[in-house]
């Protein structure tokens, strides 16, 4: 009886090990396929003109996505201005002034907002800014991306602040330091790497959004000049070129998708760099 039971346990162990390995491969496979196709279709189309020139009129060959690349960074900068202060301060409130029903409601609302489809955000900001201003604009695009960042930044900030040992707070208060100074000078400084990590993850999430920008930024064939004018962005340009009838536009859409993927990849590498010490074994 002992030998069959031992063999059965070995079989179950081998089966589960193989199953989990297969699932791990399935997780990695889509990423490999995405990289393969983007490199195959898009890398050959990347040159200096792609980064420095404006799009050519439809039907003409050449040009680039310089305006869309600049526009993407403009929108991300605005999104950070809108989303980071509100998200971080909201996370501080939830972490340091917690324990109330209001906090529970705020956490619940933030979790719900994290799952709201991005097109809904675009429709809301379209009604709040685009309609009253009578124009699509870079301002509206930055606001919608910033609003999408807020719940994610808030929740990640709350979580990293809660990892700060309570003894730090107690020691500061025992020395007569006020609570707000304790939070700003000790708690936030201690958790700064985690807060920056949350901000970068939120930026990586909104960097590739297209649907909300269709309702707010719209797109533009020229370089960005004013925040009150429509602005180009890489996700918008990729979408418009992908559905276009011209092969050269399709080629540039692949190149734009490859560059956008690299942008998100670099942001995630930055996150890994900031958090590398957190996972090292302590001696």
Where are these regions (language model features)?
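Periplasmic/extracellular loop-to-transmembrane helix junction in inner-membrane transport proteins
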Residues: 3-19, 36-79, 99, 237-251
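C-terminal transmembrane helix and the adjacent membrane-cytosol boundary/short C-terminal tail
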Residues: 15-18, 158-162, 200, 240-283
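Interhelical loop and adjacent transmembrane-helix boundary motif
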Residues: 58-59, 213-261
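Hydrophobic alpha-helical transmembrane segments of multipass integral membrane proteins
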Residues: 70, 74-82, 86, 90, ...
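Transmembrane-helix boundary motif in ABC transporter permease subunits
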Residues: 78-110, 123, 272-277
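Generic hydrophobic transmembrane alpha-helix motif, especially the helices
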Residues: 111-147
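Glycine/proline-centered hinge or cleavage motifs at structural transition points of membrane proteins
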Residues: 117, 175-176, 189
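Transmembrane alpha-helices
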Residues: 157, 179-216
């Amino acid at each position: 009886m002992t030998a069959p039971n031992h063999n059965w346990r070995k079989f179950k162990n081998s089966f589960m090990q193989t199953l989990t390995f297969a699932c791990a491969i399935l997780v990695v496979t889509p990423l490999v396929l995405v990289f393969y196709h983007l490199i195959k279709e898009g890398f050959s189309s990347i040159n200096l003109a792609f980064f420095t020139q404006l799009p050519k009129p439809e039907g003409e060959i050449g040009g680039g996505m310089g305006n869309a690349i600049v526009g993407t960074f403009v929108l991300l900068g605005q999104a950070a201005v809108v989303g980071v202060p509100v998200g971080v301060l909201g996370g501080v409130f939830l972490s340091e002034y917690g324990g109330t029903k209001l906090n529970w409601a705020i956490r619940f609302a933030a979790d719900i907002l994290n799952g709201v489809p991005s097109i809904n955000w675009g429709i809301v900001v379209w009604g709040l800014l685009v309609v009253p201003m009578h124009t699509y604009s870079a301002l509206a695009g930055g606001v919608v991306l910033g609003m999408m960042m807020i719940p994610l930044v808030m929740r990640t900030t709350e979580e990293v602040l809660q990892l700060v040992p309570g003894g730090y707070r107690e020691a500061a208060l025992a020395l007569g330091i006020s609570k707000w100074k304790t939070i700003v000078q000790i708690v936030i400084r201690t958790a700064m790497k985690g807060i920056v990590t949350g901000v970068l993850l939120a930026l990586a999430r909104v960097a590739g959004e297209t649907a909300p920008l269709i309702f707010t930024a719209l797109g533009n064939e020229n370089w960005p000049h004013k925040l009150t004018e429509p602005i180009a962005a890489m996700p918008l340009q990729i979408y418009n070129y992908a559905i276009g009838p011209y092969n050269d536009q399709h080629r540039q859409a692949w190149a734009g998708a490859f560059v956008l993927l690299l942008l998100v990849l670099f942001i995630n590498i930055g996150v890994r760099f900031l958090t590398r010490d957190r996972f090292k074994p302590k001696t």
